[in-house]
């Protein structure tokens, strides 16, 4: 039996639409991510467990984990009879890389079960392909950090899909999921087809400056450059209370904030534990919409997807 855990991720990070993402893990040791178990069997089966299992498609073939198994078998050119279990701990349509968690855990577990026939680059390419079936287009800003850990910059040149960018140990990521769903496809459809020249220039300046600040170890500069002119101005209307929440967390002391992925999760970056706690308390009282919502204080998950049992 192989059991694989794949962590939540926060894509875009305001400054890097479709090209930046970070894997995150709660500082209290809780597992924020999905778990997939694979064991040898006579025929294929898939069992869904976990807090959000009831939100998965009722038709098994529509389940992305089934599609991962099917695509992996196709890649190897043979049927691999296994019993798979998905522990769906991540809310769907949350902006925390929920579909990436399931895809990464499923494909990594299948690869481990079969003795690692695929290398990491090929596996990551498959992960992007499968996750793209849900989000509507192939982009690696959730699957790459979820699989490899840390903060990842998408390269997609020279046979390199992504490379790690150094993060800052003192940064704490407060993630507030309000409990409502925003579909990635819907959030992409709301974006303009073309952008003004000054927005393109600002976006390039922010992203280049942010990467420079990470490598030159300037956390204050990096945080200041986490601005979004590409998606947030258009997407914030999908998120009730988002604008007020951003203002409030800035006043409390967050060094940056924005939409995690396509939302509705809000991320707030803090450089002191006491600030992070105050931000988390405010968001818990004011940004959550229902009982499904949650707030976690997280740090970068540098390990990425990992085998829990083998």
Swiss-Prot record:
E.C. no: 2.7.1.39
Chief subcellular location: cytoplasm
Record's keyword annotation contains rRNA-binding: no
GO CC annotations, alphabetized: cytoplasm
Subcellular localization, as worded in the UniProt entry: Cytoplasm
GO BP annotations, alphabetical order: threonine biosynthetic process
UniProt superkingdom: Bacteria
Catalytic activity of the protein: L-homoserine + ATP = O-phospho-L-homoserine + ADP + H(+)
Pfam families named in the record: GHMP_kinases_C, GHMP_kinases_N
Pathway: Amino-acid biosynthesis; L-threonine biosynthesis; L-threonine from L-aspartate: step 4/5
Keywords annotated in UniProt: Amino-acid biosynthesis, ATP-binding, Cytoplasm, Kinase, Nucleotide-binding, Threonine biosynthesis, Transferase
Residues reported in the UniProt entry to bind ATP: 91-101
GO molecular function: ATP binding; homoserine kinase activity
Class in the EC hierarchy, top level: transferase
Family from the record: Belongs to the GHMP kinase family. Homoserine kinase subfamily.
Function: Catalyzes the ATP-dependent phosphorylation of L-homoserine to L-homoserine phosphate.
UniProt-recorded name of the protein: Homoserine kinase
